[in-house]
A protein has these predicted regions:
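Cleavable N-terminal targeting peptides that direct proteins into the secretory/outer-membrane pathway or into
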Residues: 1-22
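N-terminal periplasmic "start-of-domain" segments of outer-membrane beta-barrel proteins
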Residues: 24-56, 80-81, 96, 121
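Extracytoplasmic beta-strand/coil segments of soluble accessory domains associated
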Residues: 30, 62-103, 119
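Non-catalytic regulatory/gating segments with a bias toward low-complexity or hydrophobic composition
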Residues: 45, 53, 64-65, 121-126, ...
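N-terminal periplasmic accessory domains that precede
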Residues: 61-64, 81-85, 99, 123, ...
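Short acidic/polar hinge/loop motifs at secondary-structure boundaries
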Residues: 101-127
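Transmembrane beta-barrel wall of Gram-negative outer-membrane proteins
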Residues: 153-155, 160-191, 195-242, 246
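Surface-exposed loop/turn segments flanking beta-strands in extracellular/periplasmic regions
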Residues: 248-251
Length: 251
């Protein structure tokens, strides 16, 4: 016998599922050196869009570890130590490759250049040596920054957080001519005079960090399919490292 009590539930599901599917954001990635959606990319990949970056307050690489499975992150004086699935190392040749706009960052400090004005973040887990070469046995982190456009736009961000950390970031860009545009972003971070005391005599407060960075991108469309891109970037970091070693015998 047909039970009418199940009929309203069937109707409800038939309308609810398509509506939910329409709200899913489709992210196009370039992790395989070509454009494809996350669903069509045959790799263990996590993609974070610019909308999610803004909504969740992602400002640096440290914030990514809360969104990417199997990823961990530590930092000493701005030097990034990334591990994916437990693979990674902290020296001049890390086990996880970091690229900014497709440019390999060979040193740990260099990855800070891609933390500003992000358009998208792509994290590939597992060995990626075939496409990305050395330093990618653990995986790859692709930082894609915003490109210049003909529309004039910009923003200013100010922040203050725990341990007396202050941040400031500003970006501005637009068209220079009919086929040339630019985008400039500057960033500064300062973390007080330190937030903990070193017990050894003479070392005082530790944990101070001071960082200034900028990036200028210029794009010229030579034709409908060819463009010339120029990027100039710099980052300078000062601070006190995390103290380690034997404590002074002050008994």
């Amino acid at each position: 016998m047909f039970n009418l009590r199940y009929f309203p539930l069937i109707i409800s599901l038939s309308f609810t599922v398509p509506i939910y599917a329409e709200d899913v954001e489709e992210i196009v990635v370039t992790a395989l050196k070509r454009s494809s959606t996350v669903v069509d990319t045959p790799a263990a990949i996590t993609a974070i869009s610019s909308t999610e970056i803004e909504d969740k307050g992602i400002t640096n690489m440290h914030d990514l570890k809360h969104l990417v499975p199997s990823m961990n992150f530590t930092s000493v004086l701005g030097a990034q130590n990334i591990t994916i699935r437990g693979i990674g190392q902290f020296n001049g040749n890390p086990g996880v490759s970091v690229s900014t706009d497709g440019i390999f960052q060979s040193r740990a400090h260099s990855s800070q250049l891609g933390e500003m004005d992000l358009e998208r973040v792509e994290v590939l887990r597992g060995p990626q040596g075939t496409l990305y070469g050395r330093n990618s046995i653990g995986g790859v982190v692709n930082l894609i920054t915003k490109n210049p456009t003909q529309d004039m736009d910009g923003y200013v961000k100010l922040g203050y957080g725990e341990y007396d950390i202050t941040t400031a970031e500003a970006a501005f860009g637009g068209g220079i001519s009919d086929n040339t545009s630019f985008r400039l972003v500057v960033h500064g971070t300062e973390q007080g005079e330190g937030f903990y005391d070193c017990l050894n005599t003479g070392c005082g407060e530790q944990g101070y960090t001071d960082k200034q960075a900028f990036r200028l991108k210029i794009k010229s469309d030579l034709s409908d399919t060819v463009s010339a891109d120029l990027m100039v970037a710099s980052v300078e970091t000062e601070g006190t490292p995390d103290p380690y070693g034997c404590l002074t015998d002050n008994r």
